[in-house]
Structure formats: structure tokens, C-alpha cells
Amino acid sequence: MENFHGTTIVSVRRGDQVVIGGDGQVTLGDTVMKGNARKVRRLYNGRVLAGFAGATADAFTLFERFESQLEKHRGNLTKAAVELVKDWRTDRMLRRLEALLAIADDKASLIISGNGDVIEPENGLIAIGSGGPFAQSAARALLENTELGARDIVEKSLIIAADICIYTNRNLTIEELETGRNFPNLA
């Protein structure tokens, strides 16, 4: 059986906003199975944003586990991520999951990797999935050279990735949080 492939998820922090967006394409081998999948969600009463890349069923398993950790740790994003990773590394079933999560709240943006790592990216920019390198390059250029807001940067970088990556489409889901904190621009 072939694996489901690809997606692109981008998260940007700028000003008092954090935004996560993703495309809607699900691909099996060389066939597009679905074009309007929703890979970005709000969790914990809308206070946490999360997006996934990788095998869809695996990602839903991780979403459920992560959401239960968020509840258990009263919305503490970092603690919930670390506890999820502990489970991931010790549970035989979880160790086989092929997915990445990009998560963010008003304080932090994190990547939970397929190896069971928690990574805080430089400059509040996350890009994962098959189109991630294209979207990251575009988002970084926009952060460094424009005054665009976080939502516009996420949208434009996803569209650029969709123009280049065959596993990414232009059917976008974008969620944003107002953080009340001011994030510096890349310099």
C-alpha cells in the first residue's frame, strides 16, 4: 500500500499576531485523493493553533494525544508538547507514526517532529511538509523585506509553495491568534 504524501504548513509570528496556515491536498502516490482537507485547527478553546503534515491518520492520532496533554496541563503548550514527546518515544505504536505538528499559542511556536523532538524555531517561523522549504524561503523573504502582516505572509508563502510543490494546492485554511505581545521582525 502506498503512503499518503505531502502538505505544506506555515506559521509566522509578527507584531501581535501568530498565524498558522496549510493547504488542503491529500495525495496517495501520484493521485490527488482530496483537495479540501482541513489540516489546521484550533485547540484548547481556541487558544492554541495546530497544523499537521504527513500521514493523515497518524496526524489525527497525534492531534488527539496532544489535545489530551493540553487539557491535562491546562493549556501549557510547552509542557503538553514535551509530555506528548515522552509518550511518543516510549509507546511502540506512536514511534511508527509519520507526521509532524506545528503548534502555537500566545507565547510560543513549536514543531513536534516525527523523531519525537520538540523544536522552537528561530524568529517564530515554521514551515513543514513537502512544500515546507519553498514556503519557508518565501516567508523569510517576506518577513525580511516587507511590512506585510503575519496572515498575508502565510497566505503568500503557501501560494508560492503550491506553485512549486506538486503535493501542495491553493485550497488554504488559515487560523490566527492575537497575542497581545509584539514580535520583532527578522533583521
Swiss-Prot record:
Recorded family membership: Belongs to the peptidase T1B family. HslV subfamily.
Primary localization class, coarse: cytoplasm
PANTHER family per UniProt: ATP-DEPENDENT PROTEASE SUBUNIT HSLV (PTHR32194:SF0), METALLOPROTEASE TLDD (PTHR32194)
Residues that, per the record, bind Na(+): 162, 165, 168
Active-site positions on this chain: 7
Record function comment: Protease subunit of a proteasome-like degradation complex believed to be a general protein degrading machinery.
Record gene name: hslV
Regulation: Allosterically activated by HslU binding.
GO CC terms in record: HslUV protease complex; proteasome core complex
Keyword S-adenosyl-L-methionine attached: no
One biological process term in Gene Ontology: proteolysis involved in protein catabolic process
Origin organism lineage: Bacteria, Pseudomonadati, Pseudomonadota, Gammaproteobacteria, Methylococcales
InterPro entries, per the entry: ATP-dep_Prtase_HsIV_su, Ntn_hydrolases_N, Proteasome_sua/b, Proteasome_suB-type
Protein name: ATP-dependent protease subunit HslV
Subunit structure and binding partners: A double ring-shaped homohexamer of HslV is capped on each side by a ring-shaped HslU homohexamer. The assembly of the HslU/HslV complex is dependent on binding of ATP.
This enzyme's EC code(s): 3.4.25.2
GO molecular function term, any single one: metal ion binding
Keyword terms, alphabetized: Allosteric enzyme, Cytoplasm, Hydrolase, Metal-binding, Protease, Sodium, Threonine protease
Enzyme class (EC, first level): hydrolase
Record's subcellular location: Cytoplasm
Catalyzed chemical reaction(s): ATP-dependent cleavage of peptide bonds with broad specificity
